[in-house]
UniProtKB/Swiss-Prot annotation:
Stored InterPro entries: Glycosyl_transferase_4, PNAcMuramoyl-5peptid_Trfase, PNAcMuramoyl-5peptid_Trfase_CS
Domain of life: Bacteria
Membrane topology value: Multi-pass membrane protein
Name this protein carries in UniProt: Phospho-N-acetylmuramoyl-pentapeptide-transferase
UniProt gene name: mraY
Membrane spanning residue stretches: 27-47, 73-93, 94-114, 132-152, 168-188, 199-219, 236-256, 263-283, 288-308, 338-358
Localization, UniProt: Cell inner membrane
Length: 360
């Protein structure tokens, strides 16, 4: 929104030309989202406490988690508010890619809100019935997938980028819709599964968003896109502002979510952030890099799949408890140790993924 105003004012006040620079708006995006989160946090936490909207803890979970009962949840409202306000302030709202990410972010946020609300009101861990959650996740993802395919059909926006091979970028055709669907839904649920310890999900989300900010900038810059042998998609550059908003909001939320947490993001936050990251990965054509950058999310999800599969097929569990962060807790690792080590792994994976852009 500000960029529209600056286009008008710059003819009278040259200073406003600064707002045309993507880097300047990205910095302002981080600062704005961070400020909103820090300002909103205490108010939201107090409001949630007054409404007795507290975390419901599974009886079969680690004993160390029983003390978390009653801690305010649905803190993702803070994250989504900060991102939404920031994007509407600093992003170019004529860019359809911005709207695609925001549609998924807010749509999945609404699904997560209903899920959290039902958990809190009914005081159990069931929440929204699984088939309805999956239905709404699928519906939102398919709407975006079909819209993006119709908009970018047979262009660089629908090519498959294969790591390590600079000339291998086949057109996906209708398979683009299927890939987009699985990436968005899968990433959303993966982040949701990871959100089980204080600050565990938010920092990997921040790292991945920061990585995608660089990729979005490179993808939108014709010189760098050619240099790195990745598709040049001009619209992708504006996603830098969106990624910056996620980074700023994430740091602001971490201020209150760090161990011991004052608030949890809940499904309203984790489903939305995961869906947004998946959408960004699709838009910049780096689905494979998402698997590397989001390796923590991938491993958490695989641990659940392997645990369930092993128990049903062999009657035996592979891990003491899934997702895998609970396995390490039950092995005796203090919660902060699990969290920080997962953060370190996540940061390294993002750096490795970025390095692969040059290894072609």
């Amino acid at each position: 929104m500000i960029i529209w105003l600056s286009n008008f004012l710059e003819q009278y006040f040259p200073f406003f030309r600064l707002f045309e620079y993507l880097s300047f708006r990205a910095i302002l995006s981080i600062i704005t989202a961070l400020t909103i989160s820090l300002w909103m946090g205490p108010k939201l936490i107090a409001w949630l406490q007054n409404l007795q909207i507290g975390q419901v803890v599974r009886d079969d979970g680690p004993e160390s988690h029983f003390s978390k009962r009653g801690t305010p949840t649905m803190g993702g409202i803070m994250i989504l508010t900060a991102i939404t306000v920031t994007v509407f302030l600093w992003a170019d709202l004529t860019n359809p890619y911005v709207w695609a990410v925001m549609f998924v972010l807010l749509g999945y946020g609404a699904v997560g809100f209903v899920d959290d609300y039902r958990k809190v009101v009914r005081k159990n861990t069931d929440g929204l019935i699984a088939r309805w959650k999956y239905f709404w996740q699928s519906s939102i993802a398919l709407v975006v997938a079909f819209a993006l395919y119709a908009y970018g059909k047979d262009t660089a926006a629908t090519q498959l980028v294969v790591p390590f091979f600079k000339e291998v970028m086949p057109q996906l055709g209708l398979a683009y819709i299927l890939l987009t669907y699985f990436v968005i839904v899968g990433t959303s649920n993966a982040v949701n599964l990871t959100d089980g310890l204080d600050g565990l999900a938010i920092m990997p989300t921040v790292f991945v968003a920061a990585g995608f900010a660089f990729i979005a900038w490179a993808t939108g810059n014709v010189q760098f896109a050619n240099y790195l042998h990745i598709p040049h998609i001009p619209l992708a550059s504006e996603l830098v502002v969106v990624c910056a908003a996620i980074v700023g909001a994430g740091f602001g939320f971490l201020w209150f979510n760090t161990y011991p947490a004052q608030v949890f993001m809940g499904d309203v936050g984790s489903l939305a952030l995961g869906g947004a990251l998946g959408t960004i990965a699709v838009l910049v054509r780096q689905e494979f890099l998402l698997v590397i950058m989001g390796g923590v999310f991938v491993v958490e999800t695989l641990s659940v799949i392997l645990q369930v599969g092993s128990y049903k097929l062999r009657g035996q569990r592979i891990f003491r408890m899934a997702p895998i962060h609970h396995h390490y807790e039950l092995k005796g690792w203090p919660e902060p140790r699990v969290i920080v080590r997962f953060w370190i792994i996540s940061m390294l994976l993002v750096l490795i993924a970025l390095a692969t852009l040059k290894v072609r």
